[in-house]
Regions:
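A structural supersecondary motif
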Residues: 258, 299, 344-360
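Short, well-ordered beta-strand elements within core beta-sheets of diverse protein domains
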Residues: 160, 188, 232, 289, ...
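ATP-binding N-terminal substructure of ATP-dependent carboxylate-amine bond-forming enzymes
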Residues: 1-102, 133, 306-310, 316-317, ...
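ATP-dependent carboxylate/phosphate-activation module, predominantly the ATP-grasp catalytic core
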Residues: 166, 188-253, 257, 264, ...
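Short beta-strand-to-loop capping motifs
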Residues: 163-164, 199, 326-330, 375-381
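Conserved protein kinase catalytic/activation segment
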Residues: 268-270
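A glycine-rich beta-turn/hairpin centered on an aromatic-Pro dipeptide
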Residues: 305-349
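Active-site nucleotide/adenylate-binding loops and adjacent lid/helix of ATP-dependent enzymes
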Residues: 103-185, 191, 202-205, 230-242, ...
Length: 401
């Protein structure tokens, strides 16, 4: 049955990552309009209407929201989408979002590092760099290895680890070529295990929290998978709740998601390396729903449209789960042709859902970024989860012609 266009929601994004948000919004009665530059985005076909436009252009998004006369705007799984969303909502007086200035404090890496230092939250020692002179000063202030990254990009784009000044200068030029800002951030490398922590804030308190263990494959700065329950202990997770609430109090954050990526050091200290107030990508919000039973996509849409989410239950992970992105292995070269994706017999019984979008005959342009799809697995024990996760890139493989 078609939804009435009287209750219209603009969603900034239309990739596979936004599909759970589109479906959740529609289940809440919204007529969903998606936008974005990518005409091949898999999410657009799920929407009630699509208007192709650049969601990173906040004034274009404001004009689109006005012309469509929408009653709500939701961010897709991208920081540019989030910043445009909060800008539009601030201009139109729509609910569910922080101010544009507050959002910059969280989503621009240099501003967040300064905030964390002010609040006593562990964060990598970092310098904001404008120009080569400041870059040289940063190198003298920091201990190698260092990480060089744009302040405004996610998904591992433009991030490099440098072991010496020569590598650092190459990394600096690449980061500068990618950013839309006039500066980048340079920070000390933190040694430890990588994790995610996703919280739902209600009145400045963590009302729900979920944690995972991250996996990386060929691209060391792009998450290729996550499993749960997290290996982080109760004390570490309690610190993350406390840090989240410190940030919420300081910035007067509205109710809704606060998502964190952190490195846990050997002593259990969680060092926050990325933070955002928009849904994580690659169907992570569906992963949370599978693992806890909490309808995370629906809760996110409710929060972003100004509805009450105080009824959310703080449910722990139920069982042993993996969300795995099917990516190209070391035996596959750029320009290879996809033939199939295969799954070993021993994991067939663990598969809960397969969402494959690759097509036989398509070309893999960049092996470090190419994804054939996403698969959700459930395991019978913690040991099975860890064993099969460690071998998953061999158990689920892209086959090329």
């Amino acid at each position: 049955m078609p939804r009435s266009p009287l209750k219209k929601l603009l969603l900034l994004g239309g990739s596979h990552a936004e599909i759970p948000l589109i479906q959740a919004a529609q289940s809440l009665g919204w007529y969903v309009i998606t936008t974005g530059n990518n005409r091949d985005g898999l999410g657009h076909s799920y929407a009630d209407k699509t208007v192709f436009a650049d969601f990173s252009n906040k004034d274009a998004m404001l004009e689109l929201a006005r012309s469509e006369d929408v009653q709500a705007v939701c961010s897709g799984c991208n920081d540019f989408a989030l910043l445009s969303t909060v800008y539009v909502c601030e201009k139109l007086g729509l609910p569910g979002h922080d101010s544009y200035a507050t959002s910059l404090e969280i989503h621009h890496k240099d501003k967040y590092r300064a905030l964390a230092a002010r609040l006593g939250i562990p964060t990598p020692k970092a310098n904001s760099v404008r120009g080569e002179h400041e870059f040289d000063t940063a190198l003298s202030n920091l201990t190698f290895p260092i990480i060089v990254k744009p302040v405004d990009l996610t998904g591992g784009k433009g991030i490099h680890r440098a072991a010496n000044p020569e590598e650092a200068r190459i990394a600096y030029k690449d980061a500068c070529s990618r950013t839309r800002e006039d500066h980048i951030v340079v920070e000390e490398f933190v040694q430890g295990s990588n994790h995610g922590f996703s919280a739902m804030l209600v009145k400045g308190k963590v009302a729900f929290a979920f944690a995972d263990n991250e996996q990386y494959f060929m691209n060391k700065y792009l998450v290729s998978g996550a499993n749960t329950p997290s290996a982080s202990g109760g004390e570490t997770l309690a610190k993350l709740r406390d840090y989240s609430e410190r940030i919420a109090r300081e910035l007067h954050l509205v109710d809704g998601i606060l998502h964190i990526q952190y490195i846990e050091k050997a002593d259990g200290t969680p060092v926050i390396i990325e933070i955002c107030r928009r849904p994580p990508g690659d169907l992570y919000i569906k992963f949370v729903k599978y693992a806890t039973g909490v309808d995370y996509p629906k809760t996110i849409v409710m929060a972003e449209t100004g509805e009450d989410i105080s009824g959310i239950a703080d449910v722990p992970t139920q069982g042993y789960w993996l969300r795995h992105c099917i990516m190209a292995g070391p035996d596959i070269a750029n320009g290879s042709t996809v033939r199939d994706v295969t799954f070993a017999p021993e994991i067939q019984g663990n598969i809960v859902e397969k969402f494959l979008w690759c097509k036989p005959g398509e070309t893999i342009a960049d092996t470090l970024l190419y994804k054939a799809g996403i698969v959700f697995f459930r395991f019978g024990s913690l040991a099975e989860m860890h064993d099969k996760t460690a071998r998953m890139t061999e158990l689920a493989k892209i086959i090329t012609a």
